[in-house]
Amino acid sequence: MANSFPLRVLPTIDPSAGHTFITPSKRIHESEDVSEFLISKAYVDIMTFLLQLNRAMIPVKLADGTVQSWPINTDAVEFSAPVRQLQQLLTKLEELLAEAPPDTGPRRFGNISFRRWYELVESRASELLGECLPSELLQAKSSDPNSVTAEAELKAYFLGSWGSPQRLDYGTGHELSFLAFLAGIWKLNGFPKTTPGVEERAIVLGVIQPYLELVRTIIKRYTLEPAGSHGVWGLDDHSFIPYILGSAQLAPAISETDPTPEEGSLPGAPSPNGVTKAHIVERERLTNMYFSAIGFIYDVKKGPFWEHSPMLYDISGIQAGWGKINKGMIKMYNAEVLSKFPVVQHFPFGSLFSWDRDPNAVPPPTSAHMSTTQSQSRGPAVPSAGQTPPSGTRAPWATATQAAPPAGAGTAAPWAAKRDGCTPGKPPTSLPDTSRLPPGPMAPTRAPWAASSTGQAPGGDPTHVPTKAPWAK
């Protein structure tokens, strides 16, 4: 066994070496630009930071043979001064909600009072950041005396983290912006250097989880629409990161020399199919980020879980454990968030997240993930050798072990397995053998809707074909 696992860590900027800050600007103007993004330094830095946080949330084997896990509100994670300052920032943003009460008039989409709240945040952004972040970090000077300070870059990602005041929506692109805001602070040496995993866990539990909770409050208060969503065919209307970090919390424990687990679960962890049971969700949402996100779905959606969240329902049938779910979620984030034009088109690029090509990057294959829809001139993506194309809206790496809902109980998910011994659609036999570490772009998973066949609802009328998404082939 190797002495240590080769863990990539997001590099920090050496202030003495000179650095020129740049006001972030839009570089992704059309779907073809996504291919350039996937070989950029910005992409590598984002994935490096996310994987760094992900590994930190996996339970740890201690020297005495016990296991330390990292639930929400654990006493085992201490918050550094920068983390507490960021918590103060989130508190101030929450307090601003009182100054923008929801409009009581008729509306079709979103509450226009969200624009008022966002205007308050935008007008006070420099003041808020100045109160909650060190001045030496914000006012870090460029080597070019005519250039901007670090604040200009951080503020762009900070303001991009709360939704769109024009469209009255919030989605994974805004969540990505907050991840970049934190990664930018990391690159500027804004977090203390500690034992690997220590500060990362504080960032996740002390900042990211409170951020997600604040965002959920904002979404409910102003009835924000999903941004860049695939609707019922997507994973979640608004978020993705809690499913990555929450599945990591439930993965099997590792030592510092172990690779990131790709299957198995922490002993005593709830079964993945617990997401379909409201009482389990209510219990687990208090300690786990995955179930916390599921709990929000229960808060805002009605009806059978398999009907309004078919992909999460599909994933709940995986029997290989939370380690496999975690691996799949990372691959899916790459494919469904970072490789999707509608999601990343608004992400701005400066010096902290550079549009320059990473020298070690390998150009990604052309993929339907990089555009809003699949090209009309070509069929679905061809699966890897040895794999059977997934059917319907299945997560590409899920297995057909989840029981189907009762026949006749509303519109069935087209990919759900039939009961009474009927053979479900054959799932993919294996996951592509891809590294979980950058620098090259991760091999994107197939779009879940890319299968050419249309499934029939279990127990339904064979002449009835489920309604397809408008962008499905």
Swiss-Prot record:
InterPro entries: Phstyr_phstse_ac (IPR004327), PTPA_C_lid (IPR043170), PTPA_sf (IPR037218). It is found in: Cytoplasm; Nucleus. One of its GO terms (biological process) is mitotic spindle organization. Residues 395-416 have a biased composition (Low complexity). Its EC number is 5.2.1.8. One of its GO terms (molecular function) is protein tyrosine phosphatase activator activity. It holds the Pfam family PTPA. Residues 360-473 are annotated as: Disordered. PANTHER family: SERINE/THREONINE-PROTEIN PHOSPHATASE 2A REGULATORY SUBUNIT B, SERINE_THREONINE-PROTEIN PHOSPHATASE 2A ACTIVATOR 1. One of its GO terms (cellular component) is cytoplasm. PPIases accelerate the folding of proteins. It catalyzes the cis-trans isomerization of proline imidic peptide bonds in oligopeptides. Acts as a regulatory subunit for PP2A-like phosphatases modulating their activity or substrate specificity, probably by inducing a conformational change in the catalytic subunit, a direct target of the PPIase. Can reactivate inactive phosphatase PP2A-phosphatase methylesterase complexes (PP2Ai) in presence of ATP and Mg(2+) by dissociating the inactive form from the complex. This is Serine/threonine-protein phosphatase 2A activator 1. Keywords: Cytoplasm, Isomerase, Nucleus, Rotamase. SUPFAM superfamilies: PTPA-like (SSF140984). It is an enzyme of class 5 (isomerase). Belongs to the PTPA-type PPIase family. Residues 368-378 have a biased composition (Polar residues). It catalyses: [protein]-peptidylproline (omega=180) = [protein]-peptidylproline (omega=0).
